[in-house]
UniProtKB/Swiss-Prot annotation:
Annotated stretches, region: Disordered: 328-381, 412-443
Species the sequence originates in: Oryza sativa subsp. japonica (Rice)
Xref: CDD domains: B3_DNA
Feature: DNA-binding region: 7-110
A GO term, aspect molecular function: DNA binding
UniProt cross-references to InterPro entries, sorted A to Z: B3_DNA-bd, DNA-bd_pseudobarrel_sf, Plant_B3_domain
Protein name listed in UniProt: B3 domain-containing protein Os03g0120900
GO cellular component: nucleus
Biased composition range(s): Basic and acidic residues: 351-366
Ranges of biased composition (kind: Polar residues): 416-430
PROSITE patterns recorded: B3
One Pfam family from the record: B3
Lineage start: Eukaryota, Viridiplantae, Streptophyta, Embryophyta, Tracheophyta
Length: 719
């Protein structure tokens, strides 16, 4: 029987910089003669090239390097990690088959062997890693499929993210090797000249999805990019604060955010030319971002608040409730179109014109009494004029009413909304930090950027989301029921006056859309004329039109009374509070992850010690069984010897029995002879035969035979 050759094994847990190289245990090097005999710390001979093979038979060539007495798998190892989707805290079982050939079995975090489904092409495809994981705050374990390629097109990546692709790791954060492992594929993807015509917001979405950045990362990075006007260096400096948080005790967890944002910053530079960055230092750029919030020279095509919410929905990796996400998404502003240099110059000229008009209005600002008199005279002129507009439709005219920076957001109860806004400002002044207030602050911040001109609103040709569509104004008179003729005539007169007044107010708004006198005219007309028509104002459409006029007047006054510096400080404070809250949340997540890591480490140590004890007990039992088997073999030999002795004794005993029977037969013969002799003696003469001599001879013979028989019986020996 041939002896089965025993293979040697070792195990490695994926921790540290395992994506770049992997160390072979020093105790295992004695089984690799090519490496063990090499004593120089340098590249091993060319023959020290190995091969890794998985359970499916696929192989990867690797090279071994020796440094300070340690041997590492280097060239080719990164490809093996990438193709097998290895993640942190997973482990590999290596079996050495001689000739630098290793059989490798990967095991996931659930202690089960990973199932790697390879694609049809051996190159350019990433195997689909199906693994089981746990996620904080989720319902339980579920299977997730990783991406099939590192370099897909834009539509493929967005389709993959919308189909529910999630990075699933026990810490809910991507590890260092996940970003590092996809760098080569990302560089190749960004160097393509194909579908890179999309706007930069979509390109950033591609970067985020390829780097597997989670939701908190997207929110922080997008919010700070808006705040610092796309100055990536300024954003990176603020993220340096996260690197040195004293609350994060684990150095490895602390470096995760550090490493991740360095990669994001480096990749985002590919989308912005050098002119987009500020030549001044970071502190000066930060100061400028607070003093001059102009983005006309920046190539920004999309409102980042909307893009941030879209990215957040695609990268659902953190434990945020669906209510908060929906509430945040409902306040988002529409996406902005792609800007061109011509539009940028127009925006600059528009801003300069608005500034000059504002200065002139401040210089020529009349007294309140003169403004009211002028508004009353203008309203009287509007009431005396009865010419119809060219459109002939109040619905079409009312659609053209727009404020200075976009369409008017109309509602049925503007005063109620104004009260809510005032309440929100009071809550901000009182420094309330609850979650709803923080979300409201974030929404107001995004709206402030739109109002200040940093982010332009979308034109009429753009598709507006359903949640942001404006309620259209229309006026349809319904015939009144059970009304006497006099009231009907009065109602018709009031309706005609209402329509004529509204039409001429539309003309004033059309000629002077952002003039402060227009707001005064609207206020005076509504208070002194329209409020008198009680019967007409019972109609709901008329109420909505009046509310829209008052809202438009209020917005014009707000625009003229707008203080940029105060709003900058207010929005800066709100954004800082929002970012501090998110940073605290990140710290909390890191702390919980660190506790989980410590717990997992302690459990692993306990399990390893228990396994070691069980192995010792098993070896002891095996030794005892081996000793018992040896003693059993000895006992079997002794039993066989005893059986042979018993058989010999039985044969001797049979012989003695046969001898006794023979002696009995002889004695019987002698007795018969003795009887015959006695008969003869009685019949013959006594004197003729010496009877006594005969008897004595006979007795002597018998005595001798008995002695011989006795000696043979007494000389029986037992061995």
């Amino acid at each position: 029987m041939e002896e089965v050759r025993r293979h040697h094994h070792f195990i490695k847990v994926m921790v540290g910089e395992f994506a770049r190289r992997l160390e072979i245990p020093q105790g295992f090097l004695i089984h690799i003669p090519e490496v063990d005999h090499s004593t120089f710390d340098a590249s091993l001979p060319s023959s020290a090239k190995g091969t890794l093979q998985n359970s499916e038979g696929k192989t990867w060539p690797v090279e071994l390097e020796k440094l300070d007495g340690h041997v590492f798998l280097t060239t080719g190892w990164a490809k093996f990690v990438e193709d097998n989707s290895l993640r942190e805290y997973e482990f590999l079982l290596f079996r050495y088959d001689d000739n630098m050939h290793f059989m490798v079995l990967p095991f996931g975090l659930n202690a089960c062997e990973k199932v790697i489904r390879s694609s049809g092409s051996p190159q350019g495809k990433l195997p689909c890693d199906i693994f089981c994981c746990t996620k904080r705050g989720r319902d339980g374990d579920r299977l997730t499929e990783a991406a099939n390629s590192l370099t897909p097109s834009h539509s493929q990546v967005l389709q993959r993210t919308t189909q529910g692709h999630e990075l699933i790791s026990p810490q809910s954060f991507p590890d260092q090797h996940e970003v590092c492992g996809s760098k080569d594929g990302l560089d190749e993807h960004l160097s393509l000249n194909g579908p890179m015509e999309d706007d930069k917001a979509n390109a950033i979405a591609e970067v985020m999805s390829i780097l597997d950045v989670d939701k908190v990362t997207v929110e922080l990075f997008c919010a700070m990019l808006v705040f610092y006007k796309w100055n990536v260096d300024a954003v990176a400096e603020d993220f340096d604060i996260c690197r040195g948080k004293p609350q994060i005790q684990n150095l490895f967890l602390k470096h995760k955010l550090h490493f991740q944002f360095d990669i994001v910053k480096r990749k985002l530079r590919k989308f912005f030319p050098p002119d987009d960055y500020y030549s001044s230092p970071i502190l000066e750029s930060r100061k400028c971002s607070l003093e001059e919030p102009k983005l006309s020279n920046q190539p920004l095509q999309c409102d980042l608040t909307t893009e941030k919410c879209r990215l957040v929905d695609e990268h659902d990796l953190c434990n945020f409730s669906q209510k908060k996400r929906r509430k945040r998404g409902s306040f988002c502003s529409p996406e902005t179109p792609r800007r061109s240099p011509r539009l940028a110059r127009q925006n600059n000229s528009h801003d300069s014109a608005e500034n000059t008009l504002k200065e002139r209005s401040e210089e020529r600002q009349p007294s309140p009494d003169s403004m009211i008199d002028q508004a009353e005279s203008r309203s009287e002129q509007a009431c005396l004029c009865h010419d119809k507009t060219d459109s002939g439709s109040l619905f079409q005219d009312s659609k053209k009413v727009k404020p200075a920076h976009g369409e008017v957001d109309l509602c049925e109860e503007p005063q109620h909304n104004q009260g809510e806004n005032e309440g929100n400002l009071d809550q901000v002044n009182n420094k309330e930090t609850d979650e709803e207030q923080i979300e409201r602050n974030a929404v107001e911040t995004s709206e402030s950027f739109t109002r200040r001109g940093c982010i332009k609103s979308s034109p009429a040709s753009c598709e507006v989301p359903a949640c942001l569509r404006i309620n259209e104004l229309s006026l349809t008179w319904k015939p009144a029921e059970h009304v006497n003729p006099l009231e009907k005539v009065l109602l018709d007169i009031q309706r005609d006056n209402f329509m004529k007044t509204i039409s001429h107010v539309q003309g004033i708004i059309r000629n002077h859309p952002s003039d402060l006198l227009t707001a005064d005219v609207i206020t005076v007309v509504v208070q002194k004329e329209i409020f008198k028509w009680n019967c007409c104002l019972k109609d709901r459409d008329a109420q909505r039109i009046v509310n829209a006029l008052l809202e438009h007047a209020r917005k014009i006054k707000e625009m003229h009374n707008f203080n940029s510096e105060m709003r900058k400080e207010e929005f800066s404070a709100k954004l800082k509070v929002h970012l501090k809250w998110q940073l605290k949340e990140v710290e909390t997540i890191y702390t919980s992850l660190e506790l989980d890591y410590k717990k997992a480490t302690s459990d692993d140590n306990i399990a390893f010690s228990m396994l070691h004890d069980k192995k010792k007990k098993l070896h002891n039992l095996q030794d005892e069984i081996t000793g018992l088997q040896q003693s059993l073999e000895m006992k079997k030999d002794e039993m066989q010897k005893l059986a042979h002795q018993v058989a010999e004794h039985e044969s001797v005993f049979q012989k003695s029995l046969m001898e006794r029977l023979r002696i009995k037969e002889v004695m019987k013969g002698y007795e018969q002879t003795l009887a015959e002799v006695k008969v003869q003696l009685t019949s013959t003469e006594v004197g003729s035969i010496d009877i006594e001599a005969l008897v004595k001879v006979e007795m002597d013979n018998m005595t001798k035979e008995i002695e011989l028989s006795k000696e043979s019986l007494l000389n029986i020996t037992f061995h």
